[in-house]
Curated annotation (Swiss-Prot):
Its EC number is 2.1.2.10. GO terms for cellular component: cytosol; glycine cleavage complex. It catalyses: N(6)-[(R)-S(8)-aminomethyldihydrolipoyl]-L-lysyl-[protein] + (6S)-5,6,7,8-tetrahydrofolate = N(6)-[(R)-dihydrolipoyl]-L-lysyl-[protein] + (6R)-5,10-methylene-5,6,7,8-tetrahydrofolate + NH4(+). The glycine cleavage system catalyzes the degradation of glycine. GO terms for molecular function: aminomethyltransferase activity; transaminase activity. Disulfide bonds: none annotated. This is Aminomethyltransferase. The glycine cleavage system is composed of four proteins: P, T, L and H. GO terms for biological process: glycine decarboxylation via glycine cleavage system. It is an enzyme of class 2 (transferase). Keywords: Aminotransferase, Transferase. The keyword Transferase applies.
Amino acid sequence: MTLQHTPLNAIHRSLGARMVDFGGWDMPVNYGSQIEEHHAVRRDAGIFDVSHMCVVDLTGARVRDFLRGLLANNIDKLQTPGKALYTCMLNPKGGVIDDLIVYFFREDWFRLVVNAGTAPTDIEWITAQNAAAGTGVAITPRRSDNNAGAEPLGIVAVQGPNARAKAYAALPGTQAVGEALKPFNAGFATIDGVGEIMVARTGYTGEDGFELVVPAAQIAGVWERLLQAGVRPCGLGARDTLRLEAGMNLYGQDMDEHVSPLDAGLAWTVDLQSERDFNGKAALAANGQRDQFVGLLLRDKGGVLRAHQKVITAAGDGEITSGTFSPSLSQSIALARLPKDVAIGADVQVEIRDRRLTATVVKLPFVRNGKALVS
C-alpha cells in the first residue's frame, strides 16, 4: 500500500526523522530522542505536524440543526464566533464513530477537525446523515488527499509553556489574535508571505499552545519560521506520551465504535439533559455507564504498563487501553477501563507477561501544564 504524505514529509526526512506508517500516513515518530522531545513540550515549546488530521467545513443555512442530531455534545453551547467544542460522533448503538473538535464561525459555517484514520468513514457517515436529514449541508473536506477542489489545508500544533510567545515571534500577525483567545477558541490571522491562517488555542498535550490551520502550499514556510524561533520538532512518539500523561483518549485504542463514551471517561462530552435527540442518545440512556475510565500508576518494578494487559481488582477484571513509561513522572502509567466499584486510591494487580505487578488507581490526568497531579 502506498502511504499518504503530508505537505511536510520532505522536511521531516531532511531533519532525520524516523518515519513510520501511522494509519496509512508516512509520519515522523521522532527526530532522534523521543524523551527530549517530550520534555521540550513540558518545559519549553515543541511543534508537531498533524496535517494527517482532516478539516471538514460544513456550510449552509441548516448546519446547526444538522449538528444537533449528529453530535453527542450540545452544539448550542457554541454561540460566540470562534468558540470550539470537543465532542463524540456516535452510532445508533452509542459507540464512538470518532471524537472531534467542532468550531463555530458563522450560523452558516462550522468547521470539524476529525482523526486521520477515521476521516474517510467519518465523511461517508456525515454525508449519509445529511442526506437522511434533508438538511442540505455542503460538506467540504480540506485535507490534501480528499479536498474535492477546495484549497487543501495542513495543521501544525505548537505546544508548551513558551509556545504562544514563540509563535508570536515567528509569525507576526498572530499575537493580536492569539492574546485575545481563551482556551478552546479560535480566530484568523493574516501572515505576510502565508495569507490567512486559523489560530486555535487547542492541543493534545496537556500544555498551552496553538493549533495552526494553514494553506498546505504555505505550511512548510510556517514550520521553518517556528523552528527558527526555537521551537523543537516533535514526533508522534512524544505526542503519545504527552497525551497519555494528560489523560486524553486516543481513538481506536481507548474507545471505538463498540465503546460508549460513558465507559471511556467522556461523559462530560455528552449532553443527555437537553430535549434534542442525537444519534446514540437512546442507547446511552438505556445502557448507562457500565465501567469507569481511570489512571494506573505502576508501583512494582520489572515491567511497563501496555494496552490490553489484564487488570485484576476485587470488583472484577478490567483492561488497560493505553500504557507507557512517563518521562515526566519517571514511572509507568496507563489508562484503564475498570469496574465502577473500584475506588480511586485502590491497589490492583496487572498481568505483565507471567507476573502480577501492583498498580494504584488514580484520577486523571497525571500531568497538566507541566505539573504532576499524582504521586
